[in-house]
């Protein structure tokens, strides 16, 4: 059983590397995101935590208001998907993020988790 679990974990890591994606979860109480190694490396972070404010400021300015408004209007749904440009360690990149909302805890905080995936720049319409 333990051998199969290790094999599954290795396969999952290989697949996420191939897909250029990593996981994250929110710490609403402390206003931070906790990020996987992939996201830490992609964004050039110094630790596995980034404040909501710092992450928001990395999003290209012409997308910030739209994303904030969509997030607020969709926060009562179970999942939410978005694509946006963000400042990474090697310049601006495009990412796709899928979010899943958790039920509020005893203190009323509603943490979220999801994944962030590097994508080629979308075609201009």
Segments (PLM) and residue ranges:
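PAS-associated C-terminal cap
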Residues: 1-10, 117-125
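PAS/Per-ARNT-Sim sensory domains
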Residues: 50-72
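PAS-family sensory domain signal
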Residues: 4-56, 94-100
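Short loop/turn elements at sensory-signaling interfaces that couple input to output
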Residues: 97-123
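PAS/PAS-like sensory domains
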Residues: 16-22, 73-83
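PAS-family sensory domains
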Residues: 26, 85-93, 103-104
């Amino acid at each position: 059983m333990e051998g199969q679990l290790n094999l599954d974990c290795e396969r999952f890591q290989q697949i996420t590397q191939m897909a250029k994606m990593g996981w994250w979860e929110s710490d609403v109480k402390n206003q931070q995101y906790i990020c996987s190694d992939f996201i830490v490396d992609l964004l050039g972070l110094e630790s596995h935590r980034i404040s909501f404010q710092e992450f928001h400021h990395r999003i290209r300015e012409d997308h910030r208001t739209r994303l904030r408004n969509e997030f607020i209007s969709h926060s009562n749904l179970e999942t939410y998907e978005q694509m946006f440009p963000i400042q990474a360690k090697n310049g601006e990149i495009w990412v796709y993020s899928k979010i899943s909302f958790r039920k509020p805890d005893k203190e009323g905080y509603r943490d979220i988790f999801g994944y962030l995936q590097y994508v080629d720049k979308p075609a201009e319409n």
